[in-house]
């Protein structure tokens, strides 16, 4: 401050702003000094004078002097001339001149030079702009504007960005004011004048300004801050102006209101114009925030709006940093803005607290992305604008912040209301429009009175204020009332949604960006948001998609907003309430809460803040509040932040957090909504009715809680009522129930500790609300009331205990979500269902709400019965639907329950909370019950939905997916959103496969119910967005993590969480205080774990809060944004960020992973406890739970949880995909999100994605599409799977909880594992689930029982204990052994080691995890899909397979494999023992994930040496296990029969394992002698010299891989492999590693694989099912290993990598495991059973596997190897599978690939086997890899392979073209979006790659031989696919990077970087290939070479 000249008056600036300005000034001084130094140095050099002049810049000064000879000050000259001239030209625009002058002078006085410069530029342009409209506006503006400027914010604002802000604000205001009496600043006029008359000029000018702004910002700050400053000043000024304006008592509230109406109608675009002078009203949505700010400011809720707008602007229009800055500024500004600060001082705090997450995201180029080009149309059509915004959103979202930011931008209108919820969240997203809302949200408390007074109902009020401003402004529809109705209520709804929607929306934003409608639709939030928008402009889109209903609801609800209490519009209200729920919390809730709950909010600022944060957090305030205040509520709020974070990477923290917060906020803001909606009306109502509704609410909430039974009845009653008069009951019940629920549950929650679960529930509900949004009918109605209740309760809870809030919220949410619960169930079950529910919710809502509500009631009753149960049910419903994402974001945030949102969310929350074990167990029971009920209900509902919503389903699915994803990712969507897109796609795809889609919904619902946890886990897919967001968030900080957790998606996102990793981290830190805090802490821990040793500690905390963490882990979904959603919405956590930036684009993986971890861990614990039925114990042993579970048999639960974690992790990876896309992939994911969001129609999504693709999300797009598709289907599976996974993971989590490694491993590997598993499972499970869904339903209950009873848990713990102990003994040699033992014993050492490992690994893991995360992102991109799918698959596959395939027996083994690692294990387990198997597989998986993660951590930690130490142990373990498995498989090929014995064996198998280890060695020796020998040798070597061997091999592998593949590819991949394989490929890699340990090439990756294999082995030993899985895997491994070995060391290296990756896929990701085992199982089945059905499943699994592999595992070669083995049977079965897959899974691309894959698999396998090592090296890599890639492509795993062959096939961008297009949405979607970027990526490859890389690539291309070689060899095998493969293989490199953002993210850290990463990979590949690869290597064989030559 001292440096600022006295002339600068910063009085109007808040500290943050002043600080930023000072920073800029200081930087300016520094730069000047540096320049002087430089020049002085230059002058010292005796050189040519001309040269000197040129270098020193004297020439310029000279020119300037000549030009401005009379000007002494060059800077002044530079500034004045433009401004001066422009202003002079605009004599009329004297005001502008004045502001400009003032800007110059005042700016000089008050404003920093940079700003003044910028301002002056802006001003000049504004003048230019303004002067166009000067005639019209100048007259008014000069006086008014001057007056307004001077009077209100005159000097201060001008100081800030007087000209710009004035311009910006004036523009909208000007239109507004000119029309109305209000007078904005002249500067605004410039924009306004520019916007109405000169659109082109406006655009040009806007763009110009943006460019100048960006340049200025960059120069000034080189930070987002600069961007922030660019916009922040404007916003600040504007806000300040308005703040002063209002402060001065010059409240233009009335004017504002009027203006709002008018402005919304007329000046809607004006706002944007203000933001973007070029486009009136809509032209510049990017500037929308400013517009909103101005607009809002001028509205009654000006302070809030101002602040919110300010924040939003920052988030949206400005850089994220800007946003952050703004938000911070806003916070200080809030202080400054008297009205706001007076009304909502907490808001300021919230904002301040919230700002950091937002702060993290600062896309500098957001302005460009948000550039006018997207706005122009938008301005005309609000709806279109929103959509348009969404379309540009990908671009906008492209940057970290952009991701969020553009998203907001894209969803600006949608988010307007939303924004109010998530001021920064949605502000971030929809800074322009949303800002108005956001501020409302923020200012609801303070401005609530206004608005309240303004509108009879707060909702109406803030809807009008907020909605009008945000929404209607957004809509910009002439009929303000209609808009107001739609918007104000919508706003309310939006707001409610905002927190949730923010998260969801963020997710959706990603999705929405890709598929505006779809995304929005997919996002409940989005949907609701859409509805909000839809009401205005998005209605048609939404409506078109079944969102019309939601929209209609929204509309009516808008009206209802006013009439929250009115039940007449209850249907609408319900949706609106759903929205209000979401939005309520954020907007309505928040606002209403603010008004009604203002006291409550204030009373329980934590709750309110959480709500606010959740709501507003979306807006920084609530989040900040939550962050600060509620964090114990942090979990919730953090989720909120996470959700928003999920939603917005930069704002991701916020947006994703909102995503998470969406979850959390959903939770929170569901509560808030309840409070909000009922705040004024309902609060009293709620409070009045609380008791009455308490029962009802208790139905939902208390059902969850002690009122379980009462609530059962009430729930039924409620649901019946709701079903009967859903609208009214929803409204009433929702409100009353919610409130009572909140209150009752609050108490009860407090008592029951279900609060946490409820919190999750609330989050879920919140999320669910958005889901309900999707469902929007009753649900919404329901939710709002409930939300209000929830809000109140959450307030209480937050006040009391965030836990309770969560629990209460959950119940409440569930309750009010329960009526919508069923839709929610459906929705929850299937976020697709949610989408369906939106439609169906309307249709079926009434219809289904009767049945579904009843069922939901039932389910909810079950759920309610058990808080966890209810949570599970509700969460299943809610979480699945809204809760899942909600929970995912919210719960994930809190509970990390995105993956296992229901159970985990609830359970996790519960476990996290007080009664996790009980609740969880109940949840399990209920899950079983719910499973049955919900299954049935879900089924029927699904059927209904299928019937009714099938058409809608596409739309609904979109919404559902989005809901799903958004919730997961919600937060972030984004990645999660992306995920949601994928899900949506799948859903849409599953429109055809309605059973799949709807089934998925059903299964999700059912599974949600039956394995709510799993459902939650599925919804942990939320982390999809969350993941992305998480990753993003992680990058952002814990924001994404929060988002991830929250969204789990939005996925927290994980993305959100990750993004909020820091924020969330803090939140988590805060969280620890409360259960939710613990959850949050867990999340944070997860984040931290990912982020750092801190995370390790936190991980421990998380482990303690493991539930949360676990949930978080699973949640990791965001992050892919589903936010993003999944793309890279949030950069998610640091770890995730490392990963998710790599993931998000690394965030998902990284952050998601952490988040997934956290989520997963939390859910694991929660779920484990619940599932284990040791909930109580679990509670006791939350920390001990890991050990205890292990010992108690919680291992199964833990394992399941872990699996959930794994599932969730993949989701995070999916999220990561989102996150990756969000981060790096962020852009991609955006595209992907958009792409995926389109639904199953890849084209639509592709289009959107393409938009994003160029942004870099294409890769994610493809992958995401795949992912989403798989996710959609897999979500169903995931629903089932989550339970198992949850249980499985809990163990792993448990173990890993203690061992941070677990989290890391679990998070990273597990996540990836899950991701892969999910992918694989998704594919497989989709079919399997579809096929076995019914079966599953039945089995699901048993599975749930298995999980719940932990047959597996007990037997698993027993077996696992034994296995672990024995294997621990085996592993005792290695850290793994210790780890195992420790895990067994609750080994601290491993924890410590892991901690150390984690710490060390943290770096490695951060990098690798980044890579991993990137892979994860890929996976996560597919992950969210995958994870949910995996979860579902794991649950579904595990359970379905277990039940279905159990029935099949051996055949089941394949399904088991299909489950992925866990699913495979599950399957194996299933084969062996139904219950045990199911649980154990999950457990095994979780363990594997955990172990893998642990291994990964350890590996990373021990830097390879420990990993290798672990790896050897793991290898040994896995070898033994795999040998056992393999041997039995190989020997008997009776995986199931053998597995059964083996399962029995597993207990004994530890010993047997060693024997079998030997046998396996033998077996392996037999199948793959080279590898077998290596296996033996390697096993011994690994065990003995794993470290040495590992390092040596790793180095060798690296070198060889480098040589074989681009070093980059290898290196990142190796890291990925190390991280990923450890987690996912441990088993496979174990074999590979063992097989290839000596074959170093494999080992580096193999070692990770080894680690993973070991992890799996450990899991195996942990769980017999794991062993079985391992058994299956061993066969798989055998083939993999065999080919790998056959391939040769070099090849092995490549293969090793591939193998690892494949194994990562197989073992790491269920997919890979699945595929391996699938193949094995398929073989077994084929041989044993010979039944096409099992093989079909195998095929499915394989397809899934392939897909996952493609997505997740670059080591497809191994897969093909294994596939090769099963190839013959598999070929035929694969076709069947494809057919089945195609039908159910919609793997048409996969089907297509499948056939190819069969061919290629066989081919590749044969090739691999037949090729000599050298040939194999290159050729294998090429051919096998290609084949693998082909198979992967075929199966949807092209990416993995492509990753490997990035460079090699880079020259053949066209090669993947075919697949790329086909696979784009699908594969890329599946993989990570970055792959999607393949097509676009190709060009991007050329363009984005460094010259070095480009040259290398070109070199490769130039090498016609190389090209020919690449083409010829593979082409000979599979010409078409080879191309794709080749092309994809390069992509797999990327994909790997994508998939394992670790590889990409570490290098790039962001999705955009992902391409860079790919480039790096490519260059390495190219270099390696070019440099190290001999010509021979290029050829399949010498003949090829010769023939080619």
Swiss-Prot record:
What does the entry state regarding organ or tissue expression?
Expressed in keratinocytes.
- The record's region (Disordered) falls at 93-117, 348-391, 631-651, 806-827, 882-933, 1094-1113, 1124-1152, 1365-1493, 1521-1590, 1644-1737, 1921-1989
For biological process, the GO terms are: intracellular protein transport; keratinocyte development; multivesicular body sorting pathway; positive regulation of exocytosis; positive regulation of protein secretion
Q: Which UniProt keywords apply?
A: Epidermolysis bullosa, Phosphoprotein
- Here the segments flagged for biased composition (Basic and acidic residues) are 377-389, 910-927, 1379-1390, 1551-1560, 1573-1589, 1658-1670
- What GO annotations for molecular function exist for this entry? small GTPase binding
- Domain RabBD stretches: 7-63
User: Modified residue Phosphoserine is at which positions?
Assistant: 603, 806, 809, 1028, 1086, 1124, 1505, 1753, 1768, 1821, 1851
Protein name in UniProt: Exophilin-5
Task: Say which species the protein is native to.
Answer: Homo sapiens
Gene behind the chain? EXPH5
